[in-house]
């Protein structure tokens, strides 16, 4: 799942086009209003993504002092990776796409691409761990239960996997002025400009890596998460019918339905946010001629913008829909502004639910007001 700041430039500067400086040509220049709206959208996402995820991390760590919780730890790791995505993806992508050449040096050329790929990998793998934890908690409550130590080891493992998986990107990106050599421009504004592009030993190597990255960063993890949540939903439905027959409290049934919708929304939203950019990358890698137009960068930025929305969606689902989180957030803001100590508050685990199986009786335990 390549979300690199330099993704658009290889398309239009790989020795195949005279479109490299399409912003220069009046006929290809995107409308000012479109650029302005994109900049505003990116700014809003950047602020919401950083503020939302940072708030979630702070509140979770404050809760961890009172009670260790596996799901909270995994959510904090997810929020950390989302912050890295905001910091390393959005600013460099916007600047590089609008300027149409790289101005941050060779080290940042390699580092930004590498960190971006690592961040995306950590995000999706964190979602996988959360799905596994919820599956064990709900579908298999009597089986193996992840503990806090398992959560930390899992986080270390996914960071190591992500760091290793993205090494080829670090090695393949280089600065070069070759894309600008064959341009026919009325001025020499691009004479000394360079682009940050992927340079592979062969096209086959690039296709193998990009396809493998797509499978490992998107298709396979998303499919696994979907299966886990599907089984969770089916399990919750079955238990809902059992609770209904026992005439249990209907408020619990309503919470059950809300959790079902929440679980499905998480998966659907993540998949939908990253789908356009993945389609763009697949087309670029296999049928790049389809993208050789003066509006190539604009299409890429729109796809990238939609993907970046996922950094705001995660805090929304995992935190802002949690009434206890909203209360804690207001207390945190009040503490930051007024400097007054926060009141003690109840630790609310962000897990979905747990079951109480005793004496052959199955009943739903209390489901928190947020995941």
From Swiss-Prot:
How does the record say this protein sits in the membrane?
Answer: Multi-pass membrane protein
Those parts of the protein on the Extracellular side are 1-31, 104-111, 172-206, 285-297
- Gene Ontology MF, one: peptide YY receptor activity
Keyword list (alphabetical) reads:
Cell membrane, Disulfide bond, G-protein coupled receptor, Glycoprotein, Lipoprotein, Membrane, Palmitate, Receptor, Transducer, Transmembrane, Transmembrane helix
Cytoplasmic side of membrane: 53-82, 133-150, 228-263, 319-371
Keyword set includes Lipoprotein: yes
Give disulfide pairs as residue numbers. 109-196
Where is it located?
Cell membrane
Q: Which GO terms describe its cellular component?
A: plasma membrane
Tissues showing expression: Kidney and discrete regions of the hypothalamus including the suprachiasmatic nucleus, anterior hypothalamus, bed nucleus stria terminalis, and the ventromedial nucleus.
Q: Where is the lipid attached (S-palmitoyl cysteine)?
A: 336
Q: Where are the transmembrane segments?
A: 32-52, 83-103, 112-132, 151-171, 207-227, 264-284, 298-318
UniProt-annotated glycosylation sites, renumbered to this chain: 11, 18, 182
Kindly give the InterPro entries that the UniProt entry links to this protein.
Answer: GPCR_Rhodpsn (IPR000276), GPCR_Rhodpsn_7TM (IPR017452), NeuroY6_rcpt (IPR000986), NPY_rcpt (IPR000611)
Protein family according to the UniProt entry? Belongs to the G-protein coupled receptor 1 family.
Relate the protein's function as given in its record.
Receptor for neuropeptide Y and peptide YY. The activity of this receptor is mediated by G proteins that inhibits adenylate cyclase activity.
Q: What is this protein called?
A: Neuropeptide Y receptor type 6
Q: What is the native source organism of this protein?
A: Mus musculus (Mouse)
Lineage, broadest ranks: Eukaryota, Metazoa, Chordata, Craniata, Vertebrata
